[in-house]
């Protein structure tokens, strides 16, 4: 079994927000993603999705995005991103999954997951240029709650964020002996 991570899918099967307005690299990306995913990810694998999964504004507008995701191989674990406006309480989201028969999707929110002896904990994080103290403290608290939910703290732990981790979260990772993390938000890197 393998664990993969990919963020910022920005699916919009029910909303009129095509990604190709951001450049030709996005044209037909859903088909390319599907083909590459199915050729790489096996049914027994897991995929961490650190945010920005869907452009939907409300959960009921994300049904087709979830249907697409559910049809992909592997177990998917979603973390909230800055554009996941559809995100509700975990109870409502789990009910939504059950009502729609989406049986291979979970949410990383104030909890953690153990996959093949490796722990995954995390939170959305924040952009230090935009976040105020309240948001920073909220994300620190959520990361702490997520980490504290881990049963076997002696096992390897990987942190999951949407935003690249800022100094407070990096300090916490060091305190918790977390040596690696995955994150989304950055769609590409350009050399300056």
Task: Tell where the protein language model's regions lie, with residue ranges.
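Active-site glycine-centered loops adjacent to acidic/histidine catalytic or metal-binding residues
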Residues: 8, 51-52, 81-82, 162, ...
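Core catalytic region of metal-dependent phosphoesterases/phosphodiesterases
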Residues: 2, 15-115, 171-176
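Active-site beta-loop-alpha junctions enriched in small/polar residues
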Residues: 9-10, 82-84, 110-112, 125, ...
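Histidine/lysine/aspartate-rich catalytic loop segments that bind and position anionic ligands
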Residues: 115, 123-140
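Short active-site segment of divalent metal-dependent hydrolases/proteases
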Residues: 11, 54-55, 165, 188
């Amino acid at each position: 079994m393998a664990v993969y991570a990919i963020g910022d899918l920005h699916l919009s099967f029910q909303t009129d927000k095509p990604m190709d307005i951001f450049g030709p690299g996005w044209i037909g990306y859903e088909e390319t993603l599907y083909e590459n995913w199915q050729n790489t990810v096996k049914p027994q694998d897991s995929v961490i999705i650190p945010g920005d999964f869907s452009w939907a504004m409300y959960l009921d507008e994300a049904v087709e995005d979830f249907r697409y995701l559910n049809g992909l191989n592997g177990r998917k674990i979603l973390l909230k991103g800055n554009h996941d406006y559809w995100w509700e309480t975990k109870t409502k989201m789990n009910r939504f999954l059950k009502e729609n028969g989406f049986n291979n999707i979970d949410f990383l929110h104030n909890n953690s997951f153990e996959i093949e002896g490796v722990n995954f904990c995390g939170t959305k994080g924040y952009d230090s240029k935009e976040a105020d103290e309240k948001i920073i403290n909220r994300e620190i608290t959520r990361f702490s709650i997520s980490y504290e939910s881990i049963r076997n703290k002696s096992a390897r732990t990987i942190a999951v964020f949407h935003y690249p981790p800022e100094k407070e979260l990096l300090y916490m990772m060091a305190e918790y002996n977390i040596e690696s993390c995955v994150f989304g938000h950055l769609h590409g890197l350009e050399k300056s």
